[in-house]
Amino acid sequence: SALGLAPDLVFSIIEENKIKCDPKRNGTLHCAHSEKGMEYLIERFKQGELFKEPLTLFDKTETDNKVGSSKFFGSLHDSRAGTIQPLAYCRGLARKAKELGAKIYEKSKVSQVKKQNGIWKTYVRVIEIKSKYLLLAMNAYQDLDKSHNMGKFSTVHYSQFATRPLNSNEMSTILPGKEGCWDTAAIMSSLRVDDAGRLI
């Protein structure tokens, strides 16, 4: 599937373009925050087996040892995936795009977008920019009218915190395998350890 192939694509882009973004490809742990969450992971595991995906289902004890927390009911490990520093990855992509001739404009607020005869027209003040493709990647900072976003945006409240660098004892017990980790809760929590040894 496209989702299953995505890590190969991302990590190959990082390697080919020498993007410095703390890449770690040690897999990810999807952790069950409840018994119902564990049922969901078991179902995902069974589906993955049908497609011969490299998934491993861990019970509570194994998950406790891999995460360093006793709060989870189990987890699903996907060895294809990993973690990156997303802003550094984005900057690396921008650098490569510039090397290939792309022009990047900052502080260039788009006032209008329309499509005519298969061509996108984007307006910045009095300037019209024509393109074959248009990627709407405005995050929360967009004020185009509803006809432009066509209901494609969802509000996601998310924040990240970083601890002080973990000491050697903590490093040996909190995500010792350096996997990325997130849970099955509707309001998701995620964990990873960065190159500075901080828990993010």
What are these regions (language model features)?
Residues A32, H77, Y123, A162, ...:
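Residues in well-ordered beta-strands of folded domains
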Residues D8-K24, V110-Q112, W120, E128-I200:
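Active-site substrate-recognition segment that forms the wall
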Residues E39-E49, S70-Y133, A137:
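Helical element adjacent to the flavin cofactor pocket in flavoenzyme catalytic cores
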Residues T28, M38, N65, S70, ...:
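A broad, structure-centric signal for solvent-exposed, well-ordered loop/edge residues
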